């Protein structure tokens, strides 16, 4: 059954959809609060930590995907240059490196202004795009 077939009858909170997707894929998750969920997603190279949060004020579903990374300090300039190159090629989302906690970060916001609702396919694609984007980043590692 397609993901959206289960939600045709009624509009549903975006985080409820994310929770359903996590259950469907058998990902570990924690519903932190009504508007936020955290998940661990196993991929080929590592486990990614994903957090999705809904802001009704901004009408945006925000995804933050991270993994731990502690490059040597002398490699940070090369890392930042690679992030700039990859961000130039990313049509959606963008990468940052948070030095203090040692996290590589991919961020994406799905704007749903005007009372729009996210479909399960949009959210599933949004989550998948994070993993695909990390593939592009790996291609730039030196």
PLM regions: where:
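Ser/Thr-rich, low-complexity intrinsically disordered terminal regions
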Residues: 20, 24-63, 68
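Hydrophobic packing residues in well-ordered alpha-helices of helical domains and bundles
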Residues: 123-127
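Short, internal acidic amphipathic alpha-helical interface segments
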Residues: 66-103
